[in-house]
Amino acid sequence: MALPRPVQYGKVQRMSYGKVKEVLDLPYLLEIQKKSFQWFLDEGLREVLREISPIKDYSETLLLEFVDYYFDGPPKYSEQECKERDATYARPLKVKVRLINKETGEIKEQDIYMGEFPIMTETGTFIINGAERVIVSQLIRSPGCYFASSIDKQGRKIFSGTLIPNRGAWLEFETDASELLSVRLDRTRKVSLTTLLKAFGLYNQQLIFEKFGEDERLKASLEKEANKGELGNPVENALLEVYRRLRPGEPPNVENARNLLYSMFFDPRRYDLAKVGRYKFNKKLSLWKRIFNKRAAQDVVDPKTGEILVKEGELITREIATQIQDAGVNEVWVYADEERPFKVVGNNTVKLDRYVEFDVSDINIKELVYRPVLDDILNTTNDVLEIKRLIKERERELVPYCLTIDDIFAATSYFLGLKYGIGTTDDIDHLGNRRVRAVGELLQNQFRIGLARMERVIRERMNIHDIDTVTPQTLINIRPVTAAIKEFFGSSPLSQFMDQVNPLAALTNKRRLSALGPGGLSRDRAGFEVRDVHHSHYGRMCPIETPEGPNIGLITSLATYARVNEYGFLETPYRKVDKKEARVTNEVVYLTADEEDTYKIAQATEPVDEEGRFINQRVTVRFGEEIIEVDKHEVDLIDISPKQIVSVSTSLIPFLENDDANRALMGSNMQRQAVPLLMTESPIIGTGVEYRAAVDSGVCILAKKDGVVENVSADEIVIRNNDGTKDVYHLLKFKRTNQGTCFNQRPIVRKGQEVKAGEVIADGPSTDHGELALGKNVLVAFMPWEGYNYEDAILISERLVKEDVYTSIHIEEYECEARDTKLGPEEITRDIPNVGEDAIKDLDERGIIRIGAEVKSGDILVGKVTPKGETELTAEERLLRAIFGEKARETRDTSLRVPHGEGGIVVDVKVFSRDKGDELPPGVNQLVRVYVAQKRKISVGDKMAGRHGNKGVISRILPVEDMPFLPDGTPVDIVLNPLGVPSRMNIGQILETHLGYAAKALGWKVATPVFDGAKEEDIEEALKLAGLNPTGKTILYDGRTGEPFDNEVTVGYMYMLKLVHLVDDKIHARSTGPYSLVTQQPLGGKAQFGGQRFGEMEVWALEAYGAAYTLQELLTVKSDDVTGRVKTYEAIVKGENIPEPGIPESFKVLVKELQSLCLDVKLLSEDNKEIELKESVDEDEQPQGLGAFEIGGDEIEEDKEDDKEKFYEDLMNATQEDDQGEIDDIDE
């Protein structure tokens, strides 16, 4: 066996087991975001402004044109400042506007400020109101022309078709049970197909048959209409009929009907196919695709030269078919299956370069062009320059983005031909029919909505304003535009709060594809077909990485090599194969899903010799959705790399090929939840993608140019470049991420070191020398240990705690704002009423905690007082106050305290105040932010996982001396349950363990790429080389007794991650706390500081044991017996017996609900006396009882803990004074 070869990944050398020669490096992983936003800035904005201008008033005297746009100056704040100040990272957008007065010929030009436009950061994110957000790309149905077939009750095939625009009305073709053809316009009522054709000018049977050939279905439809016996002009009758269907209840007239049809399908403002729609229409409806491989039923003659292109009865090859189309022939008779001729009608589009003499590459028209317009241009002039100018001028007519009459005829012809096997039906889940809308396009659509709203305002203003004094500035109101953009970034479901747990999570978030969102699918309506893995996903979308749960299959990830083309379709690269020699070339082609279906494609791992010739005579290839074996000379293409089918997350799993897909899915998802650790360590067993994933995620700092390090400190690196310039790189230290993990960068270069451009000079979170390092390499043993690893639990050694192996830093942010209230402004101060000196010892003179202080739950972070409502003053008091000045006003303590269960070290304090000129929300005078950091060691209850979906919860931390140890005395770090492997079928973890053991002994770092990694024999070889047992098993000794265990145990190094599901964030306890307003039961959940729900089934359990008193107090004094719980609290404080429970509040609510249904419900005692149901205490004074149990209620109460202490006293006094033990309504 050959040894692995050393490969350099950045600064790290790994021994790679990969055998496939990679011609193409991984592309830049954030390209989809960056490229799309750049397109928007360069082209997208211009397109929208061009679409909307000119805006005319109703009399067409004023014209408003948007000429140009530019970004004026840099962003106001840097990215870091924006995060601190809750600002948006944006640049001012200016648009050059021209106002033309047609009557006087006067032209006014102005540069108009169109608001602050959010700008993408270097790492593909946006900062909106201080929060880092990502715009997820959307996967939607592409506009185009789709046909489908279904089987009806009689077992006949029924065809249907739909013309779907980017925006505008749908046109649907349908066949009903009696084979009558009908059309649905914009999802309204059906119209007969022939009626629509008449409305479009084919007004009698002869014209229709001339156009489409004779067809029984058309005949039947025409006969049915003839029986109606309408008089008058057939075109007008048809128009009126269509209008009646579309606008039932309105009086029809021919003019309105004509306008309606025009505006529905032929008005560029109302109907838009977009570039991609036109491309798909031409692809589907052009002639050649339907006639090739058919026999001609008549001679086909070139209309220009008169030569016969194909004779009757001849087979039309691909070449002849394209020749026919380019010659401008739009109608061809071919033989359908049963020797019957059928007329195929195209949509009258041709290739531009066949008709003009010059090179068309410089006019930027790649699509087929509409023939009638082209003929019109060519007939006006012969001058080449003039033709060029006309083509540029009439580009929107040559390549129309709305329907043409020929499109509708071609679609009708296609629809008719399906019955005879001419044309194909479409699979809507095929990636050739789904496209990606990335940031740029989503923003463009939003901008378009804003401009359309603005246009309405401008039109109205044009009519109101005086024509002579009007300027562009007075006409334009930018509010609709800025509002549309703000709304998109703030509340669109596709604008997501960035997942920043670790660099991989951030990278994946930016490479997401979501089928949800506006214009997409909804979770409830999406069936299995949409969610399924499709053969066209190969190399474009990852079949593994998708969430578990309701979104499975709707949210996916971009494959490693995939890219989005100009139409929004996903493309993946292949290497070309020289068919004659059966030799793989280095030429790379990118193909979309529908182009790929016609080729035979071999696997990247197919063995080839030095020259690249296939070794095997028969080669396994993919062909459409089939996998077949063909002769080596038939292969067209070969995959570029084995990892091209999976996403970045998945390509980080070594031995992926040995894992079950379901577990690999969990592995991919859990890597994104790994917490950045204090000390990072890259995996011994990697896949070679770690370096690129870390560098492209943008958390590392790369040198911009070659040079020498001049100075290094913890937070900046100075490099003197070889070209004489100097670069200073600032590092981020201990910043809080969106998820509360810690973002910290540290330099990895020394003073005087030479660096190359693009070299990693500083590591970020979860990276180690420029490689992704999400977890730690630990020594694991697979064996049961006293039942502590039952059901996936994990037993760990105390060494991992002591040596901070799995310690992570978490930073929480607390904020406190001083506002203006009705009674006066709140004040941030050290002088807090009723608080001892001990509580404020760590506050500075302003009343803000000092940096470095250690705080526990309940400690004051920011002292704040709020003015209290004053009582009416007596005359004497008023007099005294007038003489001696203002007496200290009553204030109450509303300080910011550390929440229950939190705490740590204060690492940073930021103070913003209106006086210093900081921008604050209205009504806020001061804002203080306190950052508290915690060092969290690994503890019982934390969740850990490997990279293969092997997850578990820590059940016990054993002293090192009790852990099982190896013959040389090394104790293992983790003991895992061997029963977690066989049924889960993730054998990758075992291979990783074995190879890790060998690699650690040899001092290697290994790269074993997915689907091209180390085989079993390679691992055996490495174990032998390291002088270890080739089975990978070892005798282990019990740490408690020193005896060897009965059997040999699998031991080795595995890469284990600590996940973000930490026990500290989940554990929760409550004695008293907030109550729901209506039912008076405790709230639920940690966030509300709620109680434990004692539900229906738990009640049954206690009933089954007859535990009546336990049950009684659970349902009353521990929950919603308002008076009882106060008395109980009092009794416990005084050490008395607990009193009798009263009536639960929820019973009173039930009685009230019954009374509201007009049922007279009374509560009677044993001797038929009515029991008064006292109303519960006034809303403002919420009594706080014991209540730690919630029996139902889920309403959340607003904080009403104004003056708890005083209220307790009042309540207690009232209770003692009252003999009956009932509390009367207390009014303070």
From Swiss-Prot:
Which intervals of the chain are annotated as region Disordered? 1175-1204
* Enzyme class (EC, first level): transferase
Function per UniProt: DNA-dependent RNA polymerase catalyzes the transcription of DNA into RNA using the four ribonucleoside triphosphates as substrates.
Instruction: Identify this protein by name.
Output: DNA-directed RNA polymerase subunit beta
Biased composition, class Acidic residues, residue ranges: 1192-1202
Assembly and partners are described as: The RNAP catalytic core consists of 2 alpha, 1 beta, 1 beta' and 1 omega subunit. When a sigma factor is associated with the core the holoenzyme is formed, which can initiate transcription.
Under catalytic activity, the entry for this protein gives: RNA(n) + a ribonucleoside 5'-triphosphate = RNA(n+1) + diphosphate
What GO molecular function terms would the record report? DNA binding; DNA-directed RNA polymerase activity; ribonucleoside binding
Q: Name a Pfam family for this protein.
A: RNA_pol_Rpb2_7
Classification from the root reads:
Bacteria, Bacillati, Bacillota, Bacillota incertae sedis, Caldicellulosiruptorales
Family listed: Belongs to the RNA polymerase beta chain family.
Entries under InterPro entries matching the protein:
DNA-dir_RNA_pol_bsu_ext_1_sf (IPR042107), DNA-dir_RNA_pol_bsu_external_1 (IPR019462), DNA-dir_RNA_pol_su2 (IPR015712), DNA-dir_RNAP_su2_dom (IPR007120), DNA-dir_RNAP_su2_hyb_sf (IPR037033), RNA_pol_bsu_bac (IPR010243), RNA_pol_bsu_CS (IPR007121), RNA_pol_bsu_protrusion (IPR007644)
EC numbers for this chain: 2.7.7.6
Q: Which domain of life is it from?
A: Bacteria
Q: Which keywords describe this protein according to UniProt?
A: DNA-directed RNA polymerase, Nucleotidyltransferase, Transcription, Transferase
GO cellular component annotations of the record? DNA-directed RNA polymerase complex
Q: Which GO terms describe its biological process?
A: DNA-templated transcription
What SUPFAM superfamilies is this protein classified in?
A: beta and beta-prime subunits of DNA dependent RNA-polymerase
